């Protein structure tokens, strides 16, 4: 289906805006995935704050040309599904990784984070990043553990001094 020039410009502008606002991007090949499965993926993506779109490769290359995601240009071959994480850097990677478990034909090609290219086998690094809330809770547990240890140490020192004085 032919797309006129105005529609192409609109697609490039839309994807470019999404890329500029994104924290990370993941590229996949969704050839052979059913429409209902793709609809489910798009629904999950909206809920996770991930922008997902199937875009022609030439338009995609133009859209990401002046962004940190231009490192992905070499993987824009065949049918390309791109996802931009807007809320959390690992959201798109986590979403695609979970989706790929149930879809044999869904293939994650690569990702980009902070201008760095991540091959398909490195997606786990991005997918396992803790969310903001998880990171805060991990930090709080470390702080709480250190404070508890300090309190126990001070109590032991006090008991030791009391025992020595008696």
Curated annotation (Swiss-Prot):
InterPro entries: Ribosomal_uL10 (IPR001790), Ribosomal_uL10-like_sf (IPR043141), Ribosomal_uL10_bac (IPR022973), Ribosomal_uL10_bac_type (IPR047865), Ribosomal_uL10_CS_bac (IPR002363). Keywords: Ribonucleoprotein, Ribosomal protein, RNA-binding, rRNA-binding. It comes from the Bacteria. One of its GO terms (biological process) is translation. The keyword Acetylation does not apply. GO terms for cellular component: large ribosomal subunit. GO terms for molecular function: large ribosomal subunit rRNA binding; structural constituent of ribosome. Part of the ribosomal stalk of the 50S ribosomal subunit. The N-terminus interacts with L11 and the large rRNA to form the base of the stalk. The C-terminus forms an elongated spine to which L12 dimers bind in a sequential fashion forming a multimeric L10(L12)X complex. NCBIfam families: PRK00099.1-1. Belongs to the universal ribosomal protein uL10 family. Forms part of the ribosomal stalk, playing a central role in the interaction of the ribosome with GTP-bound translation factors. This is Large ribosomal subunit protein uL10. The lineage of its organism: Bacteria, Pseudomonadati, Pseudomonadota, Gammaproteobacteria, Pseudomonadales. The gene is rplJ.
